Amino acid sequence: MTSFQVIIISFFCLILVGTLLLMLPISSRQRCVTSFPDAMFTAVSATCVTGLVVKDTATYWSLFGQAVILMLIQIGGMGVITVGLAIIRASGRKIGLWQRSTMQESISAPQVGGIVKLTGFILKTSLIIEMIGAALLAPVFCNDLGIAKGLWYSLFHSISAFCNAGFDLFGIKEPFSSLTFYHSNIYLNIIIILLIITGGIGFLVWDDIGTHKHKIRRFSLQSKVVLMTSAVLIVLPALYFFFFEYDHGTIHDRTIHSLFQSVTTRTAGFNTTDLAAMDESGTAIMIILMLIGGSPGSTAGGMKTATFAVLFLSAITVLSRRNDVQCFKRRISDEAVRSAGAVLFMYLVSFFTSGIIISRVENLPLLTCLFETSSAIGTVGLSLGITSGLSAVSRVILMILMFFGRVGGLTLIYAALPSAESQNSRLPLEKISVG
């Protein structure tokens, strides 16, 4: 098997195990067997760190069921291959070149060298950040829910936020309410925002930061592009939300709501305000942000910030009539440009076609369905409230999109198709008019 096929199969196996565990009577509060479709949808959503749900996580699932969901989020967020290699390393067995190559593809690392060390860094950093996040959230939740329940909620939401999953346990207040009851708690909002950004920015960027500290000039081109693009994609949407969506209330409330919505829309799926109250332009902007998603080698899904940046730079190159796509005094390879174009095409076709099909099947407005499909393929988890009422056909479509968005479109294609043979000759070149 190729590395791409191993990645696909490993995610399939994790989803299957999660589905079977969630079907057990002990996983539901009613101690009844959960249907296979509902259990599988939840397992796919958790493994693919999305957050779309058909059963409210707090009121339907028992403590055991919630623990299974959290396990799927943790392994799915860090990567099945990452966790697998860590287990192999802990057992004292040697990690061969094939396993290293698979890990490289799994996290989009630039080279095989140092991949084992990077695996340890990913696991250690993830667990440390999640524990810090849980400790910071504990005062809020323990004060509201008591010590035992508060600690569990702190751990659950810290991992869910860092892994950009968007699963929450606040259905105890109102089903599918997410973090709306904490919309005015600036402290909690900031902690969740920082956890989301930390998980969505990518482990490769954090490795660069850990290695070179504040010496940004020594960062890799990818890290520079990711940091710059992420900053732009946080600030600009936040400004739009501030001036056009949250144009009432105090400055402090408008600022934190705008910033939270900008950050969570691209990757996480938490919400502190009513999304259905947004106008169509705001909904359209959120769809674009969800399609872009997080960064390469992160816990998030979507097209990725680096892909968006390469596409933008390619357009600038064409408009300025230059030959090479450039950024930070470096040339970007033609292969990266072609791959970015292919990813954009696959995501647009998949999300738009799926939205049309769901709209026809469910007899729902197209924009509402496009919001749902972009949320699924971007592994975000935001919804306008239609997920639980969808038919089996629409749910299957969403599951496919979630899986597509988590493992990556190119990974799926490369896993399905045989490797292309190298060609020693090239066909004659002929121009074709575009634009």
Where are each of the predicted segments found?
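Membrane-proximal intracellular helices of multi-pass ion channels
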Residues: M1-G435
